[in-house]
């Protein structure tokens, strides 16, 4: 069974046992988090699609918090001998999917 969930403004296709990096979540390492905004679920009983499936959720365990690789930004003005350097490291949370519960059978 797989599901498509929304977190941090992005959509992720997940299966049970998968580990992935999402935008930073305010949950302690080792804690559990539940995602209720599930857009699609698929499995042996067919595909369920909806704007936000009712009674569908994905549970995950927080494995670690961290920061991604540095993105370097350089702003340059030609012929003016002007250059500006800037860097950014995005925070992320690494989660492991522990369970996917589907909507009620109709």
Swiss-Prot record:
One Gene Ontology molecular-function label: rRNA binding
Keywords linked to the UniProt accession: Ribonucleoprotein, Ribosomal protein, RNA-binding, rRNA-binding
Subunit: Part of the 50S ribosomal subunit. Contacts protein L20.
Example of a GO biological process term: translation
Protein name stated in the entry: Large ribosomal subunit protein bL21
UniProt keyword Iron-sulfur, yes or no: no
Domain of life: Bacteria
């Amino acid at each position: 069974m797989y599901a498509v969930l929304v977190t941090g403004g992005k959509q992720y296709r997940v299966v049970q046992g998968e580990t992935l990096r999402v935008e930073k979540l305010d949950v302690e390492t080792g804690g559990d988090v539940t995602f209720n905004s599930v857009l699609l679920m698929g499995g042996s009983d067919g595909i369920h699609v909806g704007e936000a499936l009712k009674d569908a959720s994905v549970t995950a365990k927080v494995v670690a918090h961290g920061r991604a690789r540095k993105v370097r930004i350089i702003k340059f003005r030609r012929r003016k001998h002007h250059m500006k350097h800037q860097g950014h490291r995005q925070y992320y949370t690494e989660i492991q999917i522990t369970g996917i519960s589907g909507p009620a059978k109709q």
